[in-house]
């Protein structure tokens, strides 16, 4: 390493920043370690860092070192000033040195020099350091002259002969310093919210000092910079061609950027210095001039600064006076009008102006609803002024670009909330709900909101979510919508919220406006198919949104239904009974309400015939949202079903749309199946595209193609909705069982035959993975049909005839599983298939379960076994005695497999999670058996050989498991005690001794383990289970148990006699909850005694 500290630092930075080019890895490591050490000791290294930053070449014309070491050096100074200066004994001297050296450096570089060559990131870094230095000035010094001295450089020039105008280089730097200083002191609310109490107190003290000593001179300088820059910009030939005799002079070329920076600084300080320094007769005119300047960034900065000014915390009356003083209504109206329709050139300015309008309206809303801090006349004046600014707000909302519109949305939400409160207050006082100007504004807002819902005709809709995704299977399905579309979706969402807020104020106004939009759109052409696609789509979307809007404001608790579309009469003095269900015939006799009229108009038109994909998909979305209206008015059904079944719907060539439509058709059938005539069901089934064709994806050689094919939703997963729809349709034919069975066979037999053929083909070609995927698909397709049927009803007097037809399906699935059980996707499909089939068919297919288990059990992974155990828990709970023989057949096999996993070692976190799942599933199965009254399965001839292992596993996990597992194991043991430990015919030989030898000790061993934390909530739950176990033991064995406990067990573990007597009394007299509390105390006393 080099000799001096400065040279060492420079060399280390050079090595570290070019590590890839250094062949000696040890040297790089030394350099990085050296630099890290410097960062740890900035109370010593700061001076080296500052020296490197200020060092010059021998002739003084340029910095001595490169950017990287200089920036690193300045970082050391920053760290010292920000966190460590107060911990050094010579803090005041260090501060004085840095102040003096900094002023000398600024004089040299920004008055006489080249201002760091104008490099922005170097100036920004320096500004950050100087702002930290200024903050510490107020903490460690009683002299506050440093800031004044630094600001004076803004008018200091290298030659005494130069006029006293601004020094542009120094001024530009000081504006950056002032900006950083304000941010550092908390002008940014986000930064302020994450700071600690001490930092906030320090910042407040520094702000007070600056307000007292420097605010006036700072404000004077900022306004002078802006005013001088504006004058320079107005000089003829101010297009930037004018050259300066020195870089310090103000010219048309640098005036605009300098004024923009200074204006932004005014915005920084507006929130915390006296408003009289920011807003005066002169400064208001400067602001107007800046808003009208030719330099666009200055106009942006001015609008943003005005936002900061009007958002300043003030008393309501003072704030209203400030807004009136600024007289921005006329200015903003003129600027909005002059920039309207100018294309992208003015869009950014309009965005900033819209933000200013939003700030003004927001502040006026706050004043208008402040009933505690504002007088009535102040609130009334705010209401009046608000209406003035709402006109430019509406104009910005109507902008052809979305960016300005987005800026005024927050204030529109607030305004509507204010008007909702105002309406309620006026009605309570017997006054008109809303004034005429307010009502006019709301009416205009509805029209504009509906207008803004419309897509641009040139939007990129292809392969987007507007049409369900990519058009073909080769496209990337995970590709997100482009940013423009995502932003428009968000805008639509906000506009819908606005429409909902207006509906809360005046529901008929919104519904009637939407009705007019739909009627005018459909009536504007001879056929809706002639409409421009974006006009047809917004007509559909407005209708689509209407139901949600009206339901939300009506407090509809039962969702959209027949009641939503008709005029429900109300009893005198009562609101319509919208949340009370009536019979369908009652609603069919009532006239349609506005929403009903909209839907009748829409669905009786031919708008669904429109050729554009976006319109087609929105039509189907609308049909599904209002599916219940097709039940109410069944004459609308044929058109909707026809659209679903032809090229517009399920036969659509566009893959993305077809996937979405499969789901929508399922939703529609599910919600309208009671209205679909049974005679058209066969034709519907015949029209569905149900061909199953498994396609293997292209994958790299190292990937598992079957996993890839099934790891995320595919086209086939979407097609499964059609198979479920088949089940839904056929389930409605229970009144014609012959037809139902015929159709069920017609639907399933081809699939069963194909499954048989594919399995046979696989036998001759066992490496053909496409055949494996085809088997997976066919199993799922067959089982998903049954998912459309209702759950099996145990109380039904006769079994539906179609259930008998499930048996050959089940048998073929088992044959396929047996042949391909080495493939996890086939095992998963078979498990899922049985879960669905058993749910619908009930006991009829339970005899096939042992075959399923034997085909699966030796191949399943631990995760698969957990799913299988959960499945058995469910069917045991549902079918109870009906599964006795099945469980007797499979329990032993399952337990053997469970123990094989539980006895394996654990390698990492994933293994721990899986093991925990296995334990819970195991005990869940045992609980299911016990709750179903199938405890005799555990001791049957087939399973009694494993009984001891099962019992010992419960004892083990009661003592060593996680709290959740412990509770499950203890609970099961308590249950077994109740069942088997009583003196009765059901008593299990040897179990009584097991109770005393193994189960009873758990009550005292578990809570005395070092790992048992009595203060932990989970541990307390375990203690509750132990208390329950004690009660079960006493209930089962009575006095014998109490005698054994007090005379044999407790003395054997050195329990004091008095404690033993107390415990036995409490076991007899207390319920589980108080006994648990006592047990908690007993354990604590026992530990204390030990």
From Swiss-Prot:
Cellular compartments annotated: Nucleus; Cytoplasm
Main location: nucleus
Family as reported in the entry's similarity comment: Belongs to the exportin family.
One example GO MF annotation: tRNA binding
UniProt source species: Malassezia globosa (strain ATCC MYA-4612 / CBS 7966) (Dandruff-associated fungus)
InterPro entries in the cross-refs: ARM-like, ARM-type_fold, Exportin-1/Importin-b-like, Exportin-T_C, XPOT
GO cellular component, one term: nuclear matrix
SUPFAM superfamilies: ARM repeat
Function noted in UniProt: tRNA nucleus export receptor which facilitates tRNA translocation across the nuclear pore complex. Involved in pre-tRNA splicing, probably by affecting the interaction of pre-tRNA with splicing endonuclease.
Protein name in the entry: Exportin-T
Record GO biological process: tRNA processing; tRNA re-export from nucleus
Keyword annotations: Cytoplasm, Nucleus, RNA-binding, Transport, tRNA processing, tRNA-binding
Gene from which this protein is expressed: LOS1
Superkingdom in the source lineage: Eukaryota
């Amino acid at each position: 390493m080099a000799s001096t500290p400065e040279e060492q630092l420079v060399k280390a930075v050079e090595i570290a920043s070019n590590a890839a080019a250094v062949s000696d890895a040890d040297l790089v490591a030394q350099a990085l370690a050296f630099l890290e050490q410097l960062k740890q000791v900035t109370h010593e290294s700061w001076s080296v860092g500052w020296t490197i930053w200020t060092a010059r070449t021998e002739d003084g014309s340029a910095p001595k070192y490169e950017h990287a070491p200089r920036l690193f050096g300045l970082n050391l100074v920053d760290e010292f000033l920000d966190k460590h200066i107060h911990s050094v004994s010579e803090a005041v001297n260090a501060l004085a040195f840095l102040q003096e050296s900094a002023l000398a450096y600024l004089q040299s570089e920004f008055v006489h020099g080249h201002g760091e060559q104008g490099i922005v990131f170097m100036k920004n870094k320096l500004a950050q350091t100087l702002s930290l230095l200024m903050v510490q000035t107020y903490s460690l010094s009683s002299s506050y002259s440093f800031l004044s001295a630094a600001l004076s450089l803004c008018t200091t020039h290298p030659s005494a002969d130069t006029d006293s105008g601004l020094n542009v280089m120094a001024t530009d730097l000081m504006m950056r310093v002032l900006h950083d200083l304000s941010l550092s002191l908390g002008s940014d609310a986000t930064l302020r919210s994450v700071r600690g109490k001490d930092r906030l107190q320090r910042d407040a003290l520094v702000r007070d000092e600056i307000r007292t000593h420097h605010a006036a001179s700072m404000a004077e300088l900022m306004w002078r910079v802006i005013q001088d820059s504006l004058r320079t910009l107005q000089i003829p030939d101010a297009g930037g061609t004018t050259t300066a005799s020195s870089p310090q002079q103000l010219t048309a070329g640098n005036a605009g950027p300098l004024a923009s920076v200074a204006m932004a600084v005014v915005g920084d300080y507006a929130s915390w210095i006296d408003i009289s320094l920011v807003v005066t007769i002169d400064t208001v005119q400067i602001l107007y001039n800046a808003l009208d300047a030719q330099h666009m960034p200055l106009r942006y900065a001015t609008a943003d600064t005005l936002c900061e000014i009007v958002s300043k915390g003030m008393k309501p009356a003072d704030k209203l006076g400030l807004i009136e003083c600024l007289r921005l209504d006329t200015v903003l109206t003129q600027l909005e009008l002059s920039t309207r329709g100018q294309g992208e050139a003015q869009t950014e300015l309009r965005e900033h102006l819209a933000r200013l309008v939003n700030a003004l309206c927001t502040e006026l809303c706050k004043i208008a609803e402040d009933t505690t801090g504002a007088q009535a006349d102040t609130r009334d004046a705010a209401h009046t002024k608000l209406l003035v600014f709402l006109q430019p707000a509406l104009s910005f909302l109507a902008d052809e670009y979305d960016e300005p519109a987005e800026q005024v949305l927050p204030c529109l939400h607030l305004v509507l909330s204010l008007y909702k409160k105002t309406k309620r207050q006026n009605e309570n006082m017997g006054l008109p709900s809303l004034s005429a100007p307010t009502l006019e504004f709301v009416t205009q807002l509805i029209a504009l909101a509906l207008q803004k819902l419309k897509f641009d005709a040139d939007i990129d809709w292809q392969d987007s979510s507007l049409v369900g995704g990519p058009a073909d299977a080769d496209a990337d399905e995970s590709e997100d919508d482009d940013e423009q579309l995502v932003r428009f979706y968000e805008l639509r969402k906000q506009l819908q919220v606005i429409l909902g807020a207006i509906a809360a104020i005046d529901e008929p106004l919104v519904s009637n406006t939407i009705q007019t939009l739909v009627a005018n759109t459909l009536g504007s052409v001879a056929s809706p198919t002639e409409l421009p696609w974006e006009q047809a789509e917004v007509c559909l979307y407005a209708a689509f949104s209407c139901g949600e809007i009206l339901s939300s404001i009506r407090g509809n608790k039962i969702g959209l239904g027949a009641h939503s579309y008709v005029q429900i009469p109300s009893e005198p003095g009562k609101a319509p009974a919208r949340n009370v269900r009536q019979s369908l015939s009652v609603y069919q006799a009532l006239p349609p309400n506005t929403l009903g009229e909209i839907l009748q108009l829409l669905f009786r038109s031919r708008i669904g015939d429109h050729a554009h994909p976006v319109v087609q998909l929105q039509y189907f979305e609308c049909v599904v949202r209002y599916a219940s209206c097709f039940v109410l008015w069944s004459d609308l059904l044929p058109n909707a079903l026809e659209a679903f079944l032809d090229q517009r719907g399920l036969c659509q060539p566009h893959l993305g749309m077809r996937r979405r439509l499969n789901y929508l058709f399922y939703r529609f059938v599910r919600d309208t199946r009671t209205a679909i005539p049974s005679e058209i069901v066969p034709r519907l089934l015949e029209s569905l595209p149900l061909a199953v064709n498994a396609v293997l994806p292209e994958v790299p050689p190292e990937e598992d193609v079957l996993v890839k094919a099934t790891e995320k939703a595919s086209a086939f997963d979407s097609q499964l909705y059609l198979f479920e729809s088949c089940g839904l349709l056929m389930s409605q034919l229970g009144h014609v069982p012959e037809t139902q069975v015929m159709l069920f066979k017609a639907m399933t037999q081809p699939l069963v035959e194909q499954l048989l053929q594919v399995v046979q083909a696989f036998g001759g070609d066992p490496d053909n993975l496409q055949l494996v995927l085809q088997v997976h698909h066919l199993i799922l397709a067959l089982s998903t049909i049954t998912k459309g049927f209702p759950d099996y009803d145990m109380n039904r007097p006769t079994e539906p005839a179609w259930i008998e037809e499930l048996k050959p399906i089940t048998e073929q699935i088992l044959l396929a599983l047996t042949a391909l059980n080495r493939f996890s996707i086939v095992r998963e499909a078979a498990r899922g298939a049985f879960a669905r089939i058993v749910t619908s068919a009930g006991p009829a297919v339970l005899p096939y379960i042992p075959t399923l288990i034997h085909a699966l059990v030796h191949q399943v992974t631990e995760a698969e076994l957990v799913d299988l155990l959960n499945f058995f828990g469910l069917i045991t709970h549902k079918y109870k005695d009906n599964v006795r023989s099945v469980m007797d057949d499979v329990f032993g096999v399952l337990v053997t497999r469970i123990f094989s996993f539980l006895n394996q070692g654990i390698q990492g976190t994933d293994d721990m999670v899986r093991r925990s799942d296995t334990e819970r599933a195991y005990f869940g199965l045992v609980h299911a058996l016990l709750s179903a009254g199938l405890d005799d399965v555990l001791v049957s001839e087939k399973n009694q050989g494993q009984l001891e292992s099962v019992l010992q596993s419960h004892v083990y996990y009661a003592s060593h498991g996680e709290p959740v597992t412990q509770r499950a194991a203890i609970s099961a043991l308590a249950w077994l005690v109740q069942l088997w430990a009583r003196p009765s015919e059901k008593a299990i030989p040897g179990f009584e001794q097991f109770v005393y030898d193994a189960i009873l000790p758990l009550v005292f061993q578990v809570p005395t383990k070092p790992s048992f934390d009595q203060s932990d909530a989970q541990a307390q739950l375990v203690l509750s289970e132990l208390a329950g176990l004690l009660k079960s033991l006493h209930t089962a064995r009575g006095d014998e148990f109490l005698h054994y406990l007090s005379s044999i067990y407790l003395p054997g573990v050195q329990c004091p006699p008095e404690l033993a007597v107390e415990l036995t009394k409490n076991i007899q007299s207390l319920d589980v909850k108080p006994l648990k509390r006592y047990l908690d105390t007993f354990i604590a006393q026992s530990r204390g005694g030990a």
